[in-house]
Amino acid sequence: MATAPTITDVQVEFLHFPAVVTSPATAKTYFLGGAGERGLTIEGKFIKFTAIGVYLEDKAVASLATKWKGKPSEELINTLDFYRDIISGPFEKLIRGSKILQLSGTEYSRKVMENCVAHLKSVGTYGDAEAKGIEEFAEAFKKVNFPPGASVFYRQSPDGILGLSFSEDATIPGEEAVVIENKAVSAAVLETMIGEHAVSPDLKRSLASRLPAVLNGGIIV
């Protein structure tokens, strides 16, 4: 796979996203596809709340290159299928959501769940199993508090496992706090971040600008 010297880190505000990370929970190594801020415009001012980094298993390179190698960033950023292939691709994703401003777990998860449920209903995949998965998601965040710099990690496996872990900083925990077994719910989390109604256009731009070099030659410039 591409290694640390050939992939650049990303800095979002005071939050550092390393080029390559290894999860002690899975013993797998992931490279940084992209990272960006998420915020809201409140009374005419854009307030940054979180920074999101999407890490990909090395299998992602061959999987995505089949269709997207040679495509320029300008084309990818406007192509929903590119992001959908990241979301649904047969490789693991590790998503880090770190807080710029303090949020309670309930405050943070409420909006994530609203967006996920809206997406699942819009595509007709919200049933009893998904409702149960969303309930498990809500429960996982109830006792969590996120001071600035604290993180949630989402591990998404190709077979539909969504593993959640929480950290006071950017350190990946050795064990996952919760495992949710629902493929639709797992995919919806990343869909809301980089899909059709993405909460982080900045993250989409980062993925589109960085991944072409990886797909073309294994190097991010």
Swiss-Prot record:
The enzyme's E.C. designation: 5.5.1.6
Name of the gene this protein is made from: CHI
Domain of life: Eukaryota
Organism, scientific name: Phaseolus vulgaris (Kidney bean)
Pathway assigned in UniProt: Secondary metabolite biosynthesis; flavonoid biosynthesis
Keywords, ordered alphabetically: Flavonoid biosynthesis, Isomerase
Residues that bind substrate: 50, 115, 192
Function: Catalyzes the intramolecular cyclization of bicyclic chalcones into tricyclic (S)-flavanones. Responsible for the isomerization of 4,2',4',6'-tetrahydroxychalcone (also termed chalcone) into naringenin.
Reaction catalyzed: a chalcone = a flavanone
Uppermost EC category: isomerase
Similarity-based family: Belongs to the chalcone isomerase family.
Annotated site residues (Important for catalytic activity) in this chain: 108
Keyword Isomerase recorded: yes
Record protein name field: Chalcone--flavanone isomerase
Family matches, as InterPro entries: CFI, Chalcone_isomerase, Chalcone_isomerase_3-sand, Chalcone_isomerase_bundle_sf, Chalcone_isomerase_sf
Molecular-function GO term, any one: chalcone isomerase activity
GO biological process: flavonoid biosynthetic process
Other known facts: Part of the biosynthetic pathway for all classes of flavonoids, a large class of secondary plant metabolites, many of which are brightly colored.
